[in-house]
Amino acid sequence: MAEVHVIGQIMGATGFSESSLFCKWGVHTGAAWKLLSGVREGQTQVDTPQIGDMAYWSHPIDLHFATKGLQGWPRLHLQVWSQDSFGRCQLAGYGFCHVPSSPGTHQLDCPTWRPLGSWREQLARAFVGGGPQLLHGDAIYSGADRYRLHTTSGGTVHLELSLLLRHFDRYGVEC
């Protein structure tokens, strides 16, 4: 089977109005993909930007996949959360990006968004925290479900991923 190695890091995030940010991440693939090593999901530590608005995470990603075809190429889905001084967490943004399909090192910028909710929910978010969240995480990368949502943009998550492709020519898989 053809193999894909994804090695890199979630470097951090910029452009969020909240501070004390952390990121929950996961990888989604099609049925023809098998994870040989690594973990499908994880979470960074909380970072409060000291200078500027960059939250630094430097969270490692190391995945090794085997596949029979290109359909269902891996996608990273991200959830950025903020934590207040009482330890309460609220959503700062959802985002996703496709893992690049060419070998080498890639710098990716993943824009994020969050559901707006009604004016009452927005008012409650401003004073109490919380706010609307998605019931199903599939809506993050499924455009068919996402177009009905009223959203606002969040910040940007910065990633650095290196890809190694192996045995694609041997198994007749063309990138």
From Swiss-Prot:
Q: Which GO terms describe its cellular component?
A: centrosome; ciliary basal body; cytoplasm; MKS complex; nucleus
Key words of the record: Cell projection, Cilium, Cilium biogenesis/degradation, Cytoplasm, Cytoskeleton, Nucleus
InterPro entries per record: C2_B9-type_dom (IPR010796)
Q: Does the keyword tRNA processing belong to this entry?
A: no
- What PROSITE patterns does the record point to? C2_B9 (PS51381)
Q: Which Pfam families does this entry report, sorted A to Z? A: B9-C2
The UniProt record lists the keyword Metal-binding = no
UniProt subcellular location: Cytoplasm, Cytoskeleton, Cilium basal body; Cytoplasm, Cytoskeleton, Cilium axoneme; Nucleus
List this protein's GO terms for biological process.
cilium assembly
**Where in the numbering of this chain does the C2 B9-type domain appear?**
2-118
Query: Mind listing the GO molecular function terms for this protein?
Result: gamma-tubulin binding
The entry assigns this protein to a family as follows: Belongs to the B9D family.
Subunit annotation: Part of the tectonic-like complex (also named B9 complex). Interacts with TUBG1.
* UniProt function note: Component of the tectonic-like complex, a complex localized at the transition zone of primary cilia and acting as a barrier that prevents diffusion of transmembrane proteins between the cilia and plasma membranes.
Mind telling me what this protein is named?
B9 domain-containing protein 2
- Top-down, what is the taxonomic lineage of the species of origin? Eukaryota, Metazoa, Chordata, Craniata, Vertebrata
